[in-house]
Amino acid sequence: MPVALRGPGLAGAATLLAAAVTAVVLAGFSLVSFPAYGNSNVLRALTVVGQTAAFTLVVVGVLCARAGERPGGRPALVRIGKLAAPTGSALLVAATLGIPLAASRLYLHGVSVDQEFRTQFLGRSATSLGLPDMAYADLPSFYPSGWFWLGGRFADLTGLEGWAAYKPWSILSLAVAAALVTVLWTRLLRTDLGAVVGVASTAVMLAYGSPEPYGAVVALFLPPVLILAWHAVAPTSRRGGRGATLATMLYLGASASTYTLYTGLAAGTVVLMAVVATAMAALAHRNAGRAPGRPLTQRPFPPRQFPPRQFPMWLPAARLAVIGFGSLAIALVVWAPYLVAALGGAPADSGTALHYLPDEGARLPLPMTAGGLTGWVCLAGLVWIVARAWTSRRAQA
């Protein structure tokens, strides 16, 4: 396969295709004055057609990848498959969100409830190259500005006002994220399995997370990044996992600049991974020292399952430090103004978001018990994780 379709090249091509697909859908449907989605079956039918085309594109990508990866297969088929699958995921986002909203310039739920401050925040970000607060002049923003700042630059580039840019920027960012996460899954798994997981993740995101686009972007990458994090803190060799360390650091830094709640979950999980990796490595070193003549395959952690003896015990902590300090440095780009003001006593010490706990935050989510298609899929995944936890590094992650 040409280098241009490996790693960053493939991600770049998928990003361009996702942007092109989204632009075609949004621009094309804006040329016709459609009735509101709830009052006509026309947009419903067109949405189904778009979704069917998206799933068909993913299936074509899977079939092409499988045919090309067989002995004697054509490399061109693999390239088509690797591009068709992420493009299908992006089209699924554009069709599911862009077509039903074609009759409106507003995003999901209009400007009601939380969408009011999100639209306002993007409007403020479009008027300044800095990091303004969503409501108050000359105050640093407590809410992470990363996604909104980029949305402001999108508004400047397209010549749209901030409130009008919120819908296309939301759909575009979700489509690009869906394409990139599909690319990442195809790199972590086989191309065909990665395509299926990528489009399934996109569908779940659309069903449950799309009203909060910046949070959905962060959540979409959380599962594959945690697999990379496990490779980072528990590599198969002393030199292995460096790329995974860099990817985890970049993700945590970007997520902290975008949505801190998911960042806390991800960071806590990575710390737990490092603790487990260190403990298992220490146990393996101790057992190996007690029985130096014992065959490696008879020791507690065979190389195919968990190879802690191939790296020193201090390596998980060192990798964790690199990830932690690196991600903090990235996050400070967005958080520094607020932290400087906080150290000076400027922000209020009451009535802020630090004192707010929503209903969802007081519950332990157990989607595998919810029933329905999503619940059954989550339950099947949980069973697989438990069954393969000892033999699969992905299940361990």
Predicted regions located by residue number:
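Transmembrane catalytic cores of multi-pass membrane glycosyltransferases
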Residues: 107, 114, 213-214, 255-290, ...
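Hydrophobic alpha-helical transmembrane segments
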Residues: 51-57, 165-181, 265-269, 372-386
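Membrane-embedded helix bundles of polyisoprenyl
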Residues: 89-93, 173-278
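Start-transfer (signal-anchor) and selected internal transmembrane alpha helices
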Residues: 1-21, 25-103
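Active-site lumenal/periplasmic loops and adjacent helix-entry segments of GT-C-fold
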Residues: 97-219
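Structural signal for the C-terminal ends of transmembrane alpha-helices
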Residues: 2-5, 59-73, 225-236, 272-285, ...
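Membrane-interfacial loop-to-transmembrane alpha-helix junctions, especially the N-terminal start
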Residues: 5-21, 78-85, 193-194, 239-245, ...
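Aromatic-rich transmembrane-lumenal/periplasmic boundary elements in polytopic membrane proteins
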Residues: 76-139, 329-352
